């Protein structure tokens, strides 16, 4: 199998060097730098020579995971502008990492910046909850028009894509916004197979209806009842081989997105045993 496998930023590792040491020990190709961590905030990532030099010594490259709080459709323009500026600067960082991908990765695969969709707030009525983005969809979707245009300009002709990841079930208004983003070649999809399993595979119809846009996978095991994810491969209910088959067919990168070092080691061992049979 020609899939490229990487690892997430792990909370047990306090430094970049700790993550790189584990990545190389396990024979993985890349690390997904997670901007939820203080050590990987944009001002830290902009020290690109430090990150690039460390990667070259180890023979690996990076993808980037944007802050999960990122909300480019916030009704407060000050908040939205701050997040948009974060995306702009992250794209500039990613451009500095393209050479690492060219040297240690697969040039055919664009460099990925991963993002979540922010559900926004909801108002609780006596009989139901109303999502504000659904109520004010026109305002919401205008933000995505602006976001797409800005990202297209910022990325330019660089081999970089922004991949939208499923989490706990795309809302209807989010699906419409994602479909608008996917009209641009600068946007694609991340399939997090553990997230989709833990919510009863509710995102699978949408993802499979747009399977040609899949470019990135977060691979970890999970279960529906009780809902669990980020398990080591082989410890849940997911048909991992079937999901990897889709990833390979679509030429996707795969992050082994467990949350502990132990689970990551088990997952790499599972893959090695699988490939040896």
Regions found by a protein language model. Give the residues of each.
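N-terminal pre-domain/capping segments
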Residues: 1-92, 102, 188
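Conserved beta-strand positions in the central sheet of alpha/beta enzyme cores
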Residues: 32, 63, 114, 163, ...
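A near-ubiquitous, low-amplitude feature marking generic local secondary-structure context
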Residues: 6, 55-59, 66, 130, ...
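Active-site acidic/histidine proton-transfer and metal-coordination neighborhood
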Residues: 56-61, 72-188
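Histidine-acidic metal/acid-base catalytic patches
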Residues: 2, 13, 17, 21-24, ...
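Active-site beta-loop-alpha junctions enriched in small/polar residues
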Residues: 8-12, 34-38, 67-71, 118-120, ...
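A generic short-segment signal for beta-strand/edge and adjacent turn/coil regions
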Residues: 1-2, 30-34, 40, 130-132, ...
């Amino acid at each position: 199998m020609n899939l490229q496998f990487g690892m997430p930023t792990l909370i047990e590792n306090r430094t970049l060097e700790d993550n790189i040491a584990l990545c190389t020990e396990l024979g993985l190709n890349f690390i997904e730098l997670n901007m939820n961590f203080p050590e990987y905030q944009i001002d830290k990532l902009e020290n690109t020579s430090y990150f690039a030099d460390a990667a070259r010594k180890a023979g690996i490259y990076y993808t980037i995971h944007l802050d999960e709080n990122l909300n480019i459709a916030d009704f407060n323009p000050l908040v939205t502008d701050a997040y948009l500026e974060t995306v702009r600067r992250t794209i500039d960082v990613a451009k500095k990492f393209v050479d690492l991908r060219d040297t240690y990765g697969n040039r055919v695969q664009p460099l990925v910046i991963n993002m979540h969709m922010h559900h926004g707030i909801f108002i609780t009525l006596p009989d139901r909850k109303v999502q504000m983005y659904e109520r004010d969809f026109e305002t919401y979707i205008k933000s995505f028009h602006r976001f797409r245009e800005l990202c297209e300009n910022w990325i330019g002709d660089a081999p970089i894509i922004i991949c939208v990841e499923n989490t706990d079930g795309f809302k209807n208004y989010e699906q419409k916004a994602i479909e608008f983003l996917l009209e641009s070649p600068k946007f694609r999809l991340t399939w997090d197979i553990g997230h989709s399993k833990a919510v009863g595979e509710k995102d699978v119809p949408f993802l499979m209806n747009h399977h040609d846009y899949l470019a990135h996978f977060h691979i970890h095991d999970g279960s529906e009842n009780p809902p669990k994810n980020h398990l080591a491969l082989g410890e849940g209910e997911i048909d991992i081989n079937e999901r990897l088959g889709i990833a390979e067919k679509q030429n996707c990168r795969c992050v082994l997105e467990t949350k502990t070092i132990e689970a990551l080691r088990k997952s790499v061992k599972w893959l090695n045993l699988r490939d040896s049979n």
